[in-house]
């Protein structure tokens, strides 16, 4: 079953990306490189919810 998760940036506190993941296949927190408008570069966003 896929659940919706929120991706947040620890440096700026942004929570602007929403994605889904399969909890059975990836039980630990997801980390993706996404674009941060505040920093104007790609940084690591981690799973918040």
From Swiss-Prot:
Keywords: Ribonucleoprotein, Ribosomal protein. The gene is rpmG1. The keyword Amino-acid biosynthesis does not apply. It holds the Pfam family Ribosomal_L33. The keyword Transmembrane helix does not apply. One of its GO terms (biological process) is translation. InterPro entries: Ribosomal_bL33, Ribosomal_bL33_CS, Ribosomal_bL33_sf, Ribosomal_zn-bd. Belongs to the bacterial ribosomal protein bL33 family. This is Large ribosomal subunit protein bL33A. GO terms for cellular component: cytoplasm; ribonucleoprotein complex; ribosome. Disulfide bonds: none annotated. It comes from the Bacteria. One of its GO terms (molecular function) is structural constituent of ribosome.
